[in-house]
């Protein structure tokens, strides 16, 4: 049984890539290791000020391996910097009502995080700091405090790609490319 | 069952007689576009995965157009352009529009068709979400991330899912106060910010056929603002005239079948549409311009891939000629070709450059993305605090033009120009 457990960070609808990683940090190149780490330290710093900081000042990573979101998470630009910044900040999974197409694809292609979809509007039920446990094989997750279990849409063919670490790793593992 | 234009282009690129929405197919890529923000990462993925000595699949299929962070002192931005330069050299790539040289162009989505890299029926991927612009010339074009782009550099192929098609039929004639931006903002307002997620947005009808190629680009550019995978318009004589002036390469125009099946069809009459704005902080926040006259503005901005073309500046100049702006008005031509047009084109014997200067606009910036996406601290036109900006760009997300506190209203160049004169949101009808 593969699980992801930890504190959640809760955001609402239409979180765009400019909020996930503001444009002034796009001078950082994700394939350069120090700059990959730097991207993590800026993850979600473009959110409006009423949100608590996702990564504390001076820290490289956040405290939240799981993001709970509403509809259309990751809309906007095609910048792969977005899932990468989240991954570099320690995010392992996002649970959203829906995703923008390019963000979903980039999350899978890079293997940075699992983009789960859920039929429930969890951003109204959960608050930042709640602890949850995702059961990837059972496609559900449990809120530790209340014991409530919510379904996740099955990831299907996407799960092994993220697990392998992205499309290149997956394609090699399964013999699609040499 | 017939196929739509999107399905037929993908079928051809996949070597299949027929396919339909939801099918996953490997398509052959004609053009891969990248720029200074995503190019270095794409190159990083390419070398990491295919090796330090790997060669790109087809040097003339790769087009590199630096445009985002050009006129800045930021050292990493310069390093990134250097990374592109050495890759171009190493791979012998013929199409590179190098900043600081005569070949420099500016914003990639205006430069790509201008330089003849977009042809009807082709498959174009770009590491930028507004790659959907190029559907205006009857191509399939969409944005991807660095990893997918690195895969294309090595193989010339990509696995993609065939999108469903949403059809938008715009009929009638276009009133002189209405622009393509008003049409697309209305559509996005109607279907919502994620109303076209994973779908092709096909634009058709008499009013679309009446639009210039530049105006068609404005429409397809913003398909992504409804979550669309691609925007597309069937080619016609205007398309062929535009392409043949710029490209010698043969192409095969592709059209949808008469009996093609679409997911939904919406019909609009252009004559009933109104000048409008998208209010902060999503492009689907539609309001007519005249219903928002109480909104006071701090600055106006004309630029970007969707609103910095010559036709956009001509529209603004129609209003600004003989008038004065009352708020700082920033002008950024998308490309060097547009910048030359501002000097060359005249209205009643006055060049556009002169008209804007007489109206009291800020000095015109050199072509690039500039403050459309905020950019480094020293970027021209970047917002600093809680300014209210009216802009011809395509996104009004929090912080998009710099400061998180600023509020961005998206509008057509006519509406932006009228508002720059009024100092508040203004309907351009009274100014024409
Ligand atoms: S002008 Fe704006 S939207 Fe267009 S490519 Fe540049 S940053 Fe992106």
Which role does the model predict for each range below?
Chain A
Residues 10, 26-138:
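Feature captures the catalytic cores and cofactor-binding loops of soluble hydro-lyases/lyases
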Residues 22, 100, 155-156:
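Generic structural signal for alpha-helix starts
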Residues 108-178:
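Acidic, glycine-rich flexible loop/linker segments
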Residues 1-33, 169-178:
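N-terminal, positively charged, Ser/Thr/Ala/Gly-biased leader segments
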Residues 1-4, 36, 127, 145:
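A generic structural signal for short, non-catalytic loop/turn and secondary-structure boundary residues
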Residues 15-16, 74-81, 162-172:
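Conserved phosphate/anionic-ligand binding catalytic regions in large, soluble enzymes, centered on
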Residues 20, 43, 152:
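Short clusters of hydrophobic/aromatic residues that line enzyme substrate/ligand-binding pockets
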